[in-house]
Swiss-Prot record:
It catalyses: 2 a quinone + NADH + H(+) = 2 a 1,4-benzosemiquinone + NAD(+); N,N-dimethyl-1,4-phenylenediamine + anthranilate + 2 NAD(+) = 2-(4-dimethylaminophenyl)diazenylbenzoate + 2 NADH + 2 H(+). Its EC number is 1.6.5.-, 1.7.1.17. One of its GO terms (molecular function) is FMN binding. Belongs to the azoreductase type 1 family. This is FMN-dependent NADH:quinone oxidoreductase. Transmembrane segments: none annotated. Binds 1 FMN per subunit. Homodimer.
Amino acid sequence: MKQILLIDVSPRGKDSASRSVADTLAARLTSLYPSAKLIRRDLAAQPLPHLDEITLRALSTRDAAEAERLKETARQSDQLTDELLESDLLVIATPMWNFGIPSVLKAWIDLVVRPGRTFQYADGEVLGLAKDKKAILVLASGGVFTEGPWRPWDFIEPYLRQILNFIGIVDVQTVRIEGMNIPELVVDAVPKANKAVAELVL
């Protein structure tokens, strides 16, 4: 493994459960792969722009003259996409907000899920171009969404798995940090997740 890309999403800093467990995972990864380059991108500290008309044109135009004129606009997306494509492992550490992902993570996704770079259409089917990579999702939530009555409300893991599969990343493992807002569960939530990290196949 040559490069690991870790995406931190939570703005809670040291109080963030997803960041805490991501720290544990990062430590294990660097121990297993000491020569690997670890890129840790903090979307809370350095939020990315959401797509606007100019950015959409810059990323989708097929006109060479327009592409040249808008290349500076596309530069950040190019850098983020290169960062993903050059990585062997993608780690996304994020909280669940309102049953889905924070908008800063969606902004990153919108900048790296690009036709001709991370996916393409061939014979009426989608071909993911970010192949031969693995992903680990570290997902924190106030409630319990892997079982029980709230399970249908979990839109975060299905969405992330679907979008990763779309671009060719099909080997996806998940670590859940659940019950952060439930007094009887919060004490064990992070330790339980750290134990799950130790059991991941890396």
